[in-house]
Amino acid sequence: MNLNRLAIPVNPYEVFKCDVPNMSTALYFVVNDAFYDKALPKSHLPEGVIFGSLKEVARQHPELVKKYYGKLADTSKDGVTAFNTTFAQDGVIFYVPKNVVVEKPIQLVNILRADVNFMVNRRVLII
């Protein structure tokens, strides 16, 4: 795990290219175990929609994350789920309010790349 938050330089645009013809998406990345916010898509999401770092959204909207995070996974019966929940350091959250439509598809690419061995606990919360 990257508990000490070692800086592992990775430019996802250098290691990933989508070759699906005629595909237009809002492209986002998770690099190793963190949401990549250094270069976000220029497309705008509808008002009220939240897409981004689970860690940052938990700071900005704690009531939203608290209401949904870890509610479906039973950590008392599954050790792997409990471990992942306990040690997840970031992830992605996608929140779409009722009656709101996101027109452009969102593409989320997870990239694992490092010069050292470490473990990654990923979290994706879709509401």
Place the predicted regions along the sequence by residue:
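Glycine-rich and polybasic anion-binding loops at the starts of cofactor/ligand-binding domains
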Residues: 1-127
